[in-house]
Amino acid sequence: GDVYKRQGQLNLPSYGNVMPNPKKSEIASRIVRGEVGGIFNIFGVDAIRQLQEVAVKESRLGIPIIVGADICNGYKTVFPIPLGLSCSWKPENIEEVARISAKEVGADGICWTYSPMVDISHDARWGRVKEGAGEDPFLGGIMAQAWVRGYQGNDLSADTTLMACVKHYALYGAAEAGRDYNTVDMSRVTAMNYYMRPYQAAVEAGVGSIMTSFNEFESIPATGNTWLLNDVLRKQWGFNGFVVSDFTAIAEMVNHGIGNSQAVGVKALKAGVDMDMIADCYHAVLKKSLEEGKITEAEIDSACRRILIAKYQLGLFHDPYKYCNPKRAAKEFLSVNNVSAARR
């Protein structure tokens, strides 16, 4: 029944290049079947508009897709890396970078960015230090809020703003020996005092979405960690946006020894992960899990509802093609104003 259509909103596949004929692509046929809530890393208004037309005109429910992309330090106009920007001690610089990025990205068909990365790290061996604001939780919190304000502005439904997605929740920068994806082992006291502030700051600034991290905390992967995703994020901090997994993170819980793909899909949904990035684990296991009573219809509904609310906030139900105006790209990309801001 309809619950399976609602489950389709929880899937975030990515198919890279869909040109020259997006409407004949594999992703288009999945959209028609109602299996896709969003896509990411597909660029350009032509391709995105065609896939959005498929969603609105050819799928049974006509629900528009949300389109995401990894934006770090600018889009067409390139700015200093986030670590460099944070060293300016000027949150207004970061806010301006995010505002300009939002205009350029929004002009290319995209409405959701996987930024900012606010992970605190004390280990220079970790390869992603450059994307954050360094070691200090207070500074990290200030800069996290500047990114969110710059991307989201005052009106998420404007075509010059993006929904931000704070990442990687949580403690991704504290991997043992700086090895990416490695285990994180620390007390809750250390976590809360030294690492968690920037995520909380982003929530206070009204960030629309949050991405889980690959690492374990207290030997439970963050993507299936109820204490992180429910007790702290939703209950303590009052986050009411939606949660997306990192790239294939749900399926990777199998490698963490949590169980088979059905077990990890159930664990992620119950912990509070609303959207499955590229693993297609939810797509593969939730129908069966519902039939077997391992999850409830209400759990699928609450995840679906959060994703639909985000699409509504972005104005996609009002105008699914609002980010797909081909004339805007020429005006926004590398404008004199943008380039002079970058040179400053």
What are the roles of these predicted feature ranges?
Residues 1-344:
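Glycoside hydrolase catalytic-domain context in secreted enzymes
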